[in-house]
Swiss-Prot record:
EC supergroup of this enzyme: translocase
Annotated TM spans: 12-32, 66-86, 96-116
GN (gene name): nuoA
Record keywords, A-Z: Cell inner membrane, Cell membrane, Membrane, NAD, Quinone, Translocase, Transmembrane, Transmembrane helix, Transport, Ubiquinone
E.C. number(s) listed in UniProt: 7.1.1.-
Protein name: NADH-quinone oxidoreductase subunit A
Family, similarity comment: Belongs to the complex I subunit 3 family.
Reactions this protein catalyses: a quinone + NADH + 5 H(+)(in) = a quinol + NAD(+) + 4 H(+)(out)
Gene Ontology terms for molecular function: NADH dehydrogenase (ubiquinone) activity; NADH:ubiquinone reductase (non-electrogenic) activity; quinone binding
Location(s) in or outside the cell: Cell inner membrane
Assembly description: NDH-1 is composed of 13 different subunits. Subunits NuoA, H, J, K, L, M, N constitute the membrane sector of the complex.
Length: 137
């Protein structure tokens, strides 16, 4: 029974900590809204550029290729994280873990080859059109 009492005391401590964090956040937000400036005007809504007049628009149109590269980076980066976790425990996982890692790497390589074949990694639109025409033949 003493273990349950210790566990209960630990949980109460965590609950008090969470209440303290929420209370502190609410206090800081409340004080900043009460003491902060409330002046609204045309100049308040403009972006601040170190005292210089703004030049150009703030919205830049980026090509969809950049988003594709970012998504591919995130996907392969997370997969590399899984491989790193496997490499830390390679001795404990034995041969079955090694075979599973090889299957995982093979799936990664198959996905990379597929992306290359479809043309997702091509920057030039002409090369993509040529590759898709070859695939259709």
């Amino acid at each position: 029974m003493p273990e349950a009492t210790g566990l209960m005391a630990h949980n109460w401590g965590f609950a008090i900590f969470l209440l303290g964090v929420v209370g502190l956040c609410a206090f800081m937000l409340g004080v900043s809204s009460l003491l902060g400036s409330k002046a609204w005007g045309r100049s308040k809504n403009e972006p601040f550029e170190s005292g210089m007049l703004p030049t150009g628009g703030a919205r830049l149109r980026l090509s969809a290729k950049f988003y594709l590269v970012a998504m591919l980076f995130v996907i392969f980066d997370i997969e590399a994280l899984f491989l790193f976790a496997w490499s830390v425990s390679v001795r404990e996982s034995g041969w079955t873990g090694f075979v599973e890692a090889l299957v995982f790497i093979a799936i990664l390589l198959a996905g990379l080859v597929y992306l290359f074949r479809v043309g997702a990694l091509d920057w030039a639109p002409e090369a993509r059109r040529k590759r898709q025409a070859k695939l259709k033949q």
